[in-house]
């Protein structure tokens, strides 16, 4: 029997992280398998496992590795299916494995989650499979609800223990009027007329691409060009959860029925965290190098708390984000899968970009 998800460990010592993934998949009733194969010490085994797994119908691969964590990228080089990377903290607080996984070269696109976040890898795999499976989506909603309830319960417990003389419990007993801050920023950003971009607020598309600032328009253009090549329908909008929070949330609500979102942002990249807080489907994050060479944006995108993963690609790597979209949607769409395989197999992947 073929599992839907295959977890590949670079070493047996990574099992403790993989158990977090397996626990989530068990809870969500998703079939999975497990192999141990090192990208460096048993390269042929990785190759054979991935090629055979793809042939027999595995839909999602998860690579778990530490140190120079090249395993997820090697997996991606042998399959057109989506690959999720879980960097493991073995040394340098896991930063070495995080960078090795997320900065994978095009076209071996990898969806990276936070360091040691095996649980988020399981949730991301479920979100990918849930695009075409209502039962998985229902189970995911229940899981997200349990995470929300934990937050409310923890507040009640902590407040009940506070005995300060000046402590006053602030009750939320009225609705807060919706009001955007810095509305002039919204007018400035949305005044740009970008040729060839779909900006019709069309909720009947497959992908919603959201850019937080015109500063990163080149990254967005790369994504949109490749989506056009793969004939994947998409919407594009420039809006910020910081400058225009109400406009932003309204837009997410309008687009809630799309199959996946892409958030593009720099600095403290709040955009992807804001998207994933409002919806329960796949969110791909593209960090941009506005400051600190993009390291600030990368870390604020990828290291999400339990329950809310962001499928993060490399810094300024719009091309890998677009290819990851193709890998994900190709599971559910034969034409996209065929087009994607042809481009990769012929080593002609978007050579004009």
Name each region found by the language model.
Residues 2-4, 28-31, 56-59, 79-82, ...:
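Short coil/turn connectors at secondary-structure junctions
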Residues 2-41, 198-241:
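Glycine-rich phosphate/diphosphate-binding loop of Rossmann-like nucleotide-binding domains
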Residues 3, 9-14, 20, 94-204, ...:
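C-terminal binding/interaction regions
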Residues 9, 36, 65, 86-89, ...:
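Short beta->alpha connector loops at strand-helix junctions that form conserved
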Residues 14-19, 43-45, 65-74, 92-95, ...:
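Short glycine/serine/threonine-rich phosphate/pyrophosphate-binding segments
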Residues 21-27, 50-51, 77-80, 127-128, ...:
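Short, solvent-exposed amphipathic alpha-helical segments in soluble enzyme
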Residues 44, 48-87, 249-287:
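Glycine-rich phosphate-binding loop
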Residues 67, 78-106, 278-306:
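Glycine/small-residue-rich loop that forms an oxyanion/phosphate-binding "nest" at active or ligand-binding sites
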């Amino acid at each position: 029997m073929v599992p839907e998800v295959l977890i590949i460990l670079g070493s047996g010592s990574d099992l403790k992280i993989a158990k977090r993934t397996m626990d989530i998949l068990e809870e969500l009733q998703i079939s999975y398998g497990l192999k141990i194969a090192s990208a460096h010490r048993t390269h042929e085994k990785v190759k054979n496992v991935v090629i055979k797994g793809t042939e027999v119908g595995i839909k999602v691969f998860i690579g778990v590795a530490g140190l120079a964590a090249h395993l997820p990228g090697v997996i991606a080089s042998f399959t057109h299916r989506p690959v999720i990377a879980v960097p493991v903290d073995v040394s340098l607080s896991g930063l070495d494995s995080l960078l090795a996984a997320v900065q994978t070269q095009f076209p071996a696109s990898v969806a990276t989650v936070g360091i040691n976040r095996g649980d988020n890898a399981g949730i991301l795999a479920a979100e990918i499979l849930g695009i075409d499976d209502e039962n998985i989506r229902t189970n995911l909603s229940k899981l997200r609800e349990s995470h929300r309830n934990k937050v409310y319960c923890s507040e009640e417990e902590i407040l009940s223990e506070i005995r300060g003389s000046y402590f006053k419990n602030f009750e939320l007993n009225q609705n807060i009027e919706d009001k955007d801050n810095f509305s002039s920023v919204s007018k400035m950003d949305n005044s740009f007329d970008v040729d060839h971009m779909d900006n019709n607020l069309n909720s009947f598309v497959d992908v919603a691409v959201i850019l937080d600032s015109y500063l990163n328009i080149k990254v967005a253009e790369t994504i949109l060009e490749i989506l056009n090549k793969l004939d994947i329908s998409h919407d594009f909008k420039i809006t910020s959860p910081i400058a225009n929070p109400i406009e932003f949330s309204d837009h997410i609500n309008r687009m809630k029925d799309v199959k996946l979102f892409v958030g593009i942002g720099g600095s403290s990249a709040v955009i992807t965290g804001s998207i994933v807080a409002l919806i329960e489907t796949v969110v791909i994050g593209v960090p941009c190098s506005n400051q600190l060479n993009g390291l600030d944006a990368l870390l604020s995108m990828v290291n999400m708390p339990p329950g809310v993963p962001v499928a993060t690609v490399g810094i300024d790597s719009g091309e890998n984000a677009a290819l990851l979209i193709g890998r994900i949607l190709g599971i559910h769409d034969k034409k996209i899968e065929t087009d994607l395989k042809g481009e990769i197999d012929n080593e002609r992947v978007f050579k004009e970009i």
